[in-house]
Amino acid sequence: MSTIAVDAMGGDSAPEEVVKGAILAKQEGIDVILSGDKNLILSYLGDEKIPIVDYPQVISMDEDPAKAIRTHKNSSILGALTLLKEKKADAVFSAGSTGATLIGSISVLGKICLLYTSDAADELCS
């Protein structure tokens, strides 16, 4: 079974909606590790048991991605990417800053790692 490292703090409605998605994924049998502010994530998890790595800093959409990656060493996206580097996860998901994800992947993994897949890709991209 593959494990997905999820940037729980990335996205407009994070972490609440991201945690809800992680709970649904777990219920479908998908292994998830959440990266973000542990105390805040726990407040949305309820009784669900999903592993969390505590990376409390958030990179907002309006921040300069390169500067943010340099100054936010405990950011949730870097935490998720570190899980991938350490082979504790097989993939990373983030709904946060694409620029921070791109620069973070170069910083942590030494390569660009962005991928979009969807069964509906033809409809979405036509």
Q: What is each model feature region?
A:
Residues 1-106:
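Contiguous, glycine/small-aliphatic-enriched amphipathic segments in soluble metabolic enzymes
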Residues 104-118:
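A glycine- and small-aliphatic-rich helix-loop capping segment at beta-alpha/alpha-beta transitions
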Residues 116-126:
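Single conserved hydrophobic/aromatic residue that forms the stacking wall/gate
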